[in-house]
Amino acid sequence: MFNLLLDFDGTLFDTESGHEAAYLETFAHFNLGPCPSYESLKGIKTREVFDRYQSIHYNTDEMAQYKSSAYQAGLSAVKAFVDLNLLNQLRVKGVGLYIVTGGSRKSIEGLLNLHQAKDLFNGIVCAEDYYRSKPDPEPFLHCIRQYAVTGEIHGVEDSVQGIQSVRAARLRAIGVHNSEVEKLADAYYPSINTYLSELIER
């Protein structure tokens, strides 16, 4: 059995601008000071980001909910990086497809439903399902345990934290879309679709 454990934001869907705008709006609304670069926040749970800014005036849940609502407002504008037809071909060939993300289940399933893509995946692991964020291996290890994934497993990621998480889980790390991860990954593809096409043909 061959399996792909796929990151979501920046790997399957072009969500970066939406998340970045939502973080900027939230930091401004709560007067939290300069917002960190989105690159440094990739793969980290939203709650963990705002844990650092909790105060007597605002709590983590309040800030995380505001950010989530700001992101949800622009969900319909998010485009797919991945060719969903390629994922469907892999599924037909018997490849196991799993999402492993630091995003909330509401955001992930909302976007998948908009693209009628939820049924392509054998399982989805979201921020609510584990304790330690990427670069810790827990998100990927949790997916393997939760869905009893066996056989050859590749982890596909676009961020440094994500690739580190895959490697810490002792999986083959496939980097996509971000040249910063090329030196860390076992293999790198500028487009996830090139990688998926290779898998279909092999």
Model-assigned labels for residue ranges:
Residues 6, 21, 36, 69, ...:
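Intrinsically disordered, low-complexity segments enriched in small/polar residues
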Residues 85-113, 166:
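Substrate-recognition element of Asp-dependent hydrolases with the DxDx(T/V) motif
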Residues 2-84, 89-93:
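N-terminal helical cap/lid subdomain that shapes the substrate entry/recognition surface
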Residues 41, 100-102, 156:
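Structural motif
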Residues 73-78, 102, 131-132:
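Short, flexible loop segments at the rims of nucleotide/cofactor-binding pockets, characterized by
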Residues 1-2, 105, 109-202:
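Asp-based, Mg2+/Mn2+-dependent phosphohydrolase catalytic module
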